[in-house]
Amino acid sequence: MYFRASIFRIWIFTSSLVFSFSCFALIEVTDDLNNKIVLSKPAKRIISLAPNITEILFHIGAGSSIVGADEYSNYPSAAQSIMRVNNHSIANYELIISLQPDLVVAWYSGNGVDIIERLRHLGLPVFVLEISTMDQIPVLYQKLGQLTGSTKKSKEAARLFSERLDELRSNYLGKTKVKSFYQIWDDPIMTLNGKHLVSDVIELCGGENVFLNASPLVPQVNIESIIAANPEVILSSGSEARVKSWRQKWSRWPSINAVRQGHMYLIPPDLMQRQSNRILDGADYVCQFIERYRQDQSSQI
């Protein structure tokens, strides 16, 4: 009888430990807006509200858990079959709720406060990202890896990203600064200030964003201010088919150093506009184009 009673007490004790552990083994992650997201288990039904988020989730091994995505999520190809729940300014809240997500991942400057707050008001856990530097990306991988249970692959992705980033840094460290202008729209002319990830890429390559201190994040600038800044390299995103017409527009202002010397370059759009793992490929282009200017100057000495 004593033996049985002892076994019973041990069973009760160990069961209570297991129960306590299950109660307290919560997943807690802080997002880029300093909000804490708490999940009782890894998310398996995820809503991605932006294409960069979709790319990252696939990259860290959580793509199969995405049940809803924005209409621009087209990479990788597996993303094209996912249910569409939003565009950049409108979300289908009824559809999102019907998909019973256990996690929503949003992009602050891309989706906006209204959509994010509405989803939170509906009781959904929303992780918000807002990347302004390259160093934030491997950290983001690991945070999303925790939330999705894809910790092993996310750590490996973070390691590989950091290694490649460090290699780029070492290649261009100490190089002569090159005044650079990044155009995202032509009518009106718009650019990106120093708080945007693209500006960090330019700096990584030894460039200097001529509108570093402008405001807001995406400022509208006039041609007079560009002439005054006199960039040595002008960058934008677009296809090869657009290069000729784009350069032709700039040819009206030959007083700008970049125009006069022909240092105007287009980068494949998704590589720079999406804050995902492919930003490193975009950075390769930026660094090569800025380096062309340096080499051109060296050859003229």
What are these regions (language model features)?
Residues 50, 108-109, 184, 214, ...:
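Short secondary-structure boundary segments
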Residues 44-99, 103-108, 210, 238:
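A short, structured surface patch at a secondary-structure boundary
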Residues 32-34, 85-94, 214-223:
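Short helix-initiation/N-cap motifs at beta->coil->alpha
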Residues 91, 136-139, 143-146, 155, ...:
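Structured C-terminal subdomain patch of bacterial secreted/periplasmic proteins
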Residues 70, 195-218, 238, 265-266:
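His/Asp/Glu-enriched short active-site or ligand-binding loop at hydrolase and phosphoryl-transfer sites
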Residues 93-100, 122, 221-230:
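Short helices/loops that flank or line small-molecule/ion binding pockets
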Residues 2-3, 8-15, 22-54, 151-181, ...:
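Bacterial Sec-exported substrate-binding components of ABC uptake systems
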Residues 75-78, 111-143:
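Flexible loop/hinge segments that line or gate small-molecule binding clefts
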